[in-house]
Design a protein with these regions (language model features):
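Eukaryotic intrinsically disordered, low-complexity regulatory linkers and tails enriched in Ser/Thr/Pro
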Residues: 1-93, 97-99
Length: 99
C-alpha cells in the first residue's frame, strides 16, 4: 500500500524494518514503507523534497536537529520527528493531533 500524508494523519510509527503503522483519525494502516520513505514521498507528492523542506525549517527556525517538516502548507500538514529522522526508531507526530 502506498501512503501519502494527509490532514487526517496523526502518527507514522515504525512497525518493522520495512513497514510502518500509520494512525489516522479513525483508522490504522500497515504500510510497506519506512516512515522516512513515507515522508520523502509525501513531500514529493506535494511538490517539494524532504531535504528542501528540512533546510527551510532549519533556516527559518535557526534549529539544527529534529525540526518540524511542513509537508503541505495550504492544509497545515506539519509533522515532528521524535528522534533523528535517520533513526529506524523515529516516529513522526502530526501537529494536527487533538484530544
Amino acid at each position: 500500500m502506498k501512503y501519502d500524508i494527509s490532514r487526517g494523519t496523526l502518527a507514522i510509527v515504525p512497525n518493522s524494518e520495512e513497514n510502518s503503522l500509520v494512525y489516522e483519525d479513525d483508522s490504522r494502516y500497515i504500510v510497506n514503507e519506512t516512515p522516512f520513505k513515507i515522508m520523502e514521498d509525501s513531500c514529493k507528492y506535494f511538490g517539494s523534497t524532504y531535504n528542501g523542506r528540512k533546510d527551510s525549517a532549519k533556516s527559518i527556525l535557526g534549529a539544527e536537529y529534529k525540526v518540524p517538516i511542513i509537508v503541505e502548507e495550504n492544509n497545515n500538514i506539519i509533522v515532528f520527528p521524535t528522534t533523528s529522522p535517520s533513526s529506524a526508531d523515529c516516529v513522526w507526530i502530526s501537529l494536527g493531533i487533538r484530544k
